[in-house]
């Protein structure tokens, strides 16, 4: 009653005798009181899940027992299952012998007695023995059926039946992976992984060098042994047809990796090897990498997702061993360290670039064999007019009419070698060196075409002459502009100069990059027009070649 101490008006309950009240209660009322007290103050020793009031307890409405009903259902279901099993293969007698003699049928003439058990006489121990006996008999029947196709149960239960030991036959089934002549199961049932490859057939094809077998796929075959993988690697040493060898998720270890390494040293036809998701350690991977030093054919190698971690030392050793390799293009492994990862990326990029250059060189050689001597004439024809528009306008910026002549000659030159294969006649000898070019007032010499024909000139001297001539021209232009800017107002000539500015000059103003020494003929012409004036123009006779 201490729980009501927080309420008011408890004085009227102080005179009540609790013992008298409890004595006056009946048994049912006492049970209800106990339940109420359990709800108010549950037992702290009980777990939380058992402290609440049970709401599933109900009084039975008749002679019903739930436990007896559940036991009856279990027994009936077991009997139904046994009847179904026996109905498929016939009536099979139940043996009461020990578990050691379950798979052996004795030669004795004793008949197996069938006992019928009632529900009242069955006990738990006998039920367990009966279930074990029926399961083991079913296994023996299924194994015998898988080996011999059908089982004659009359001969099994006959008096003069010979002993049939199925253990050795079951072991033979496991060794041959279920491949029997009379077995009509599908390949998916033979290999639960879904790989339809038949191991023995594939090995025979590799040994016989079958031309149709270009890929050996052993992926996801779990029951393949390491000795079988070693046999595959040894058979591939002499094979010249197989290009791809993949054995991912086959539980391959270092011994299989060593065999693959020995195979790669000898075989010069396999281009793709996949050993992902296996039990290979760093020792086996390094053996394969050392074998690649003697292999110049393999282009793709995958060994990611191994059971053992490679480690930093193994990754660095892999990079060292692959530095000299020039044929590997794809490597299926994620390096943990950034240093080996970047080094391996650069190695693979280098190899791909070498392959690309090799391919381009082969294409050029094929074109050379097809073209023959005509290619030389084509190259000479292309090379002769290409150099003319870059040098001539710089030496003659003061005479505007000469520049269009050069442009016309440049435009008219490509037609001459096409019409007549021999080269054009040589022009007159060149003028004296840059002593006449330095002073700005006199016009420059005629177009320096003979200099282009000279083959023995030095590039450094030509560049120096161009730079000196350009500086002299710029100095002369600055002097003339300084004198004439005051006299000339804002005229139409300035607007023309601004409109004739090339795109390259606008880009050069934005950036601080120096101008390139070589420019096109159009830009040189525009520069000469902007730097010239009407007073500088002179009449020039048209040359005989253009009349």
Curated annotation (Swiss-Prot):
Residues 521-540 form the WH2 domain. Residues 16-41, 113-148 form a coiled coil. Residues 1-161 are annotated as: Interaction with actin 1. Residues 419-449 have a biased composition (Pro residues). InterPro entries: LRR_dom_sf, TMOD, WH2_dom. Residues 352-367, 494-512 have a biased composition (Basic and acidic residues). GO terms for molecular function: actin binding; actin monomer binding; tropomyosin binding. It is found in: Cytoplasm, Myofibril, Sarcomere; Cytoplasm, Myofibril; Cytoplasm, Myofibril, Sarcomere, M line; Cytoplasm, Cytoskeleton. Residues 149-160, 465-475 have a biased composition (Polar residues). Residues 95-104, 112-139 have a biased composition (Acidic residues). The modification Phosphoserine is found at residues 11, 15, 24, 400. Can bind at least three actin monomers and thereby provides a nucleus for actin filament formation. Interacts (via N-terminus) with tropomyosin alpha (TPM1) (via N-terminus). May also interact with TPM2 (via N-terminus). Interacts with FLII. Belongs to the tropomodulin family. It is linked to Cardiomyopathy, dilated, 2G: A form of dilated cardiomyopathy, a disorder characterized by ventricular dilation and impaired systolic function, resulting in congestive heart failure and arrhythmia. Patients are at risk of premature death. CMD2G is an autosomal recessive form characterized by early-onset, severe cardiomyopathy that progresses rapidly to heart failure in the neonatal period without evidence of intervening hypertrophy. Mediates nucleation of actin filaments and thereby promotes actin polymerization. Plays a role in the regulation of actin filament length. Required for normal sarcomere organization in the heart, and for normal heart function. This is Leiomodin-2.
